């Protein structure tokens, strides 16, 4: 009898996280990792007012460039789209760790480094806001309450036993 081969192919990844990590490593186009990067980045950036189209977001992810168009595109839109891809990678790589203020601030640091916000005296990259603001016409938590509210949120989130992640291909920001 022949000995069993030691280089048998590995079994297919079993969890969503395994699939995401494998597709990220393999640079798979059209898989769930590819879709998540584009859809989450496009929708998140549009909530914040980005004017990039879905196709432009996809193009930045796939090529690290943006085609020349007739419309002016804000540099911050391009920077935040590219850094958003890095944030999703960080989340995937840290998915097994408890969610923490340190990770949230690290993601903010990645996202905002190099943007025009980073040049503002009152804006702190990688930390909580210092001034009150609103998003989409809605009031947000006051700066002095952000840390305690985040702690409450993290305590509630990290106490959950079965945290699931679902992706809806039908829900997205208007294009």
What residues fall within each predicted segment?
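FIC/Doc superfamily catalytic core
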Residues: 1-175
């Amino acid at each position: 009898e022949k000995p069993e081969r030691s280089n048998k192919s590995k079994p297919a990844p079993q969890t969503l996280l395994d699939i995401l990590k494998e597709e990220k490593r393999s640079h798979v186009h059209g898989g769930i990792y590819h879709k998540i990067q584009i859809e989450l980045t496009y929708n998140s950036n549009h909530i914040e007012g980005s004017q990039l189209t879905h196709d432009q977001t996809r193009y930045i992810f796939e090529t690290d460039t943006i085609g020349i168009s007739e419309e002016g595109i804000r540099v911050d839109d391009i920077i935040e789209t590219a850094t958003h891809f890095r944030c999703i990678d960080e989340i995937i790589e840290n998915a097994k760790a408890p969610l923490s203020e340190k990770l949230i601030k690290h993601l903010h640091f990645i996202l905002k480094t190099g943007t025009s916000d980073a040049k503002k005296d009152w804006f702190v990259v990688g930390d909580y806001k210092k001034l009150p603001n609103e998003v989409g016409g809605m009031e947000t938590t006051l700066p002095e309450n952000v840390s305690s509210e985040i702690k409450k949120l993290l305590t509630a989130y990290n106490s959950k036993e079965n945290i699931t992640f679902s992706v809806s291909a039908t829900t997205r920001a208007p294009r």
